[in-house]
A protein has these predicted regions:
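Short Gly/Pro-enriched turn/cap motifs at secondary-structure boundaries
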Residues: 71, 123, 338, 355-360, ...
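Bacterial N-terminal signal peptides that target proteins for export
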Residues: 1-7
């Protein structure tokens, strides 16, 4: 009897963990990453003007991260860090870099007339990636949206980096167009039916800048966000019976700001009339740039609602992890809608403090995770970075991750926050925009600007008391500054790619005097 009882208990334990012999079901993963969306651009993060009801609903059902960071403040390096799990001191792609730079006489927009120029610097052919890891775990993988990590035909196209199905923009420069002449489906260039629309030019003289009809020349027949959403939904439907990972790397709301006119007019009625952008400063002239920006974000939010409904219809919603985030902070150029919408949320976000900077406005990201009804709705102040995605997905998929700089946050998703490991530190470097370095340790953030100019003076902020980074307290805490520099020196390595733009030498540290 005692032996029978022990056997029964052992069998019951096995059933509890594996559904009586069946392998535990691996969750599907949908990773929606906006492009240049600010921390404060979603309703669930405090936005009051842009409507995002479907994403807000996800936040109310899942976990909202308050301290999630991009690993880089710009598109290509951010995406490289996600794919490799490496922080910017170890990663390959450390800046945006076109593989073929057009002659200055042609101008930056020459790529819209000569698509043989398209594409960016590729990663190395043997690079371990998050997508390859998920393939090894038995997942079907897709990316719909923007790639930007290797030109067509290179050793670093989506298909060669672990993506089973790709549809969208190979080239991030061409991704600035919402009515493109072509998109890529795997390695095949697909004509969209749109005519070429040149960017970076002002509204022609003689046209009335206050007349919406003057801007019709900048609209095509087929809106890229709709073309890509349809492919995403098709992928989900076709793979509903097996584990899948879909990376939805939308180009919204990156300039040029464009959206369907009826959706723009909704916000014109809501926000009122506004000054048009006529100089091409947002890549294209636009009669209602603020209303259009808002309409773009809401357009994707509506698609989120459609996709959630489809997942429920297919019966796979309860086993689908749905993540919403952004690649980096909002653009802060002279025509940016960022100030009007307070896109930086609680963080200072102005010229030099958003995208392309390592201030909080450039790297602190909205980050929402839902998993059917499995998660207890909550907020977490766990400090995390995009490098954590690789080990987290590995834990969820039951596979060993390649070497990476991340810390899995799977315990938070699995309802075991007491087992969550914390980062000893987060590290950033960025060799563009005069060069930046940053480290976060607990509430402390060290920041070095103008690194390429040889500046070695670190600013220090206590983010708990000063999230806007207003008060530099480095002089009061020389011991913390010294520790930050030790972390920098231990984590900086040259990029393995022979691209000068990716390299940055460390300056001589200027340490504050100890009392």
């Amino acid at each position: 009897m005692k032996t029978d009882k022990l056997l029964f208990l052992a069998a019951a334990a096995a059933c509890a963990g594996t559904a009586c012999g069946k392998t535990p079901e691996k969750p599907n993963i949908i990773y929606l990453m906006f492009d240049d969306l600010g921390y404060g651009d979603l309703g669930c993060y405090g936005q009051e003007k842009i409507e995002t009801p479907n994403i807000d609903a996800l936040a109310s059902q899942g976990i909202l991260f308050t301290d999630m960071y991009s690993a880089a403040p710009l598109s290509a390096p951010s995406r490289c860090c996600i794919m490799t799990g490496q922080h910017m001191g170890h990663s390959q792609i450390r800046a945006n870099y076109e593989r073929l730079v057009p002659p200055e006489s042609l101008g930056w927009n020459a790529i819209f007339l000569d698509d043989t120029l398209e594409g960016q610097q590729p990663m190395l052919a043997d690079t371990p990636t998050l997508a390859k890891m998920m393939q090894e775990a038995g997942y079907k993988t897709a990316m719909v949206g923007k790639w930007g990590l290797g030109y067509p035909g290179s050793e670093s196209t989506p298909g060669k980096m672990g993506i089973d199905y790709f549809y969208g923009f190979n080239c991030q420069s061409l991704a600035h167009a919402y009515y493109p002449t072509h998109l890529w489906e795997n390695d095949t260039k697909i004509a969209t039916g749109n005519e070429t629309i040149m960017q970076g030019e002002p509204l022609p003289e003689g046209l009335d800048p206050m007349d919406i009809a003057s801007y019709e020349r900048y609209t095509g027949k087929f809106y890229s966000s709709d073309l890509m959403y349809d492919k995403l939904e098709n992928f989900v439907v076709e793979n509903a019976g097996r584990p899948f990972m879909a990376m939805w790397t939308t180009t919204v709301p990156h300039s040029a700001v464009q959206a369907p006119l009826d959706e723009v007019m909704h916000y014109v009625e809501k926000l009122g009339d506004e000054k048009p952008c006529t100089d091409g400063g947002m890549y294209l002239p636009n009669r209602y740039p603020l209303a259009t920006y808002a309409a773009m974000v809401t357009h994707i939010d509506t698609q989120v609602g459609r996709l959630v409904a489809k997942l429920k219809e297919l019966g796979i919603w309860e086993n689908t992890i749905f993540i919403v985030t952004s690649d980096n902070g909002p653009a802060c150029n002279g025509n940016s809608p960022m100030e009007f919408f307070q896109s930086g949320g609680p963080f200072r976000c102005r010229q030099g403090w958003g995208k392309s900077s390592l201030h909080e406005g450039g790297i602190r990201m909205p980050f929402i995770v839902t998993w059917g009804s499995r998660l207890t709705p909550s907020k977490t102040a766990h400090v995390a970075q995009f490098t954590d995605l690789m080990p987290t997905f590995a834990d969820l998929a039951g596979v060993k991750a390649p070497q990476n700089d991340g810390v899995s946050f799977a315990p938070i998703l699995l309802g075991k926050p007491e087992k969550q490991q914390e980062h000893e530190f987060l590290y950033w470097e960025y060799p563009s925009a005069k060069g930046w370095l940053a480290v976060r340790v607990g509430p402390w953030k060290g920041l070095v600007k103008r690194v390429i100019k040889g500046n070695g003076k670190m600013e220090l902020y206590n983010l708990e008391d000063d999230p806007r980074e207003d008060k530099d307290v480095a002089a009061e805490h020389p011991d913390i500054v010294k520790r930050m520099w030790e972390i920098i020196e231990a984590n900086h390595e040259p990029s393995p790619l022979p691209v000068e733009k990716f390299q940055m030498n460390l300056p001589q540290p200027e340490l504050p005097a100890e009392e």
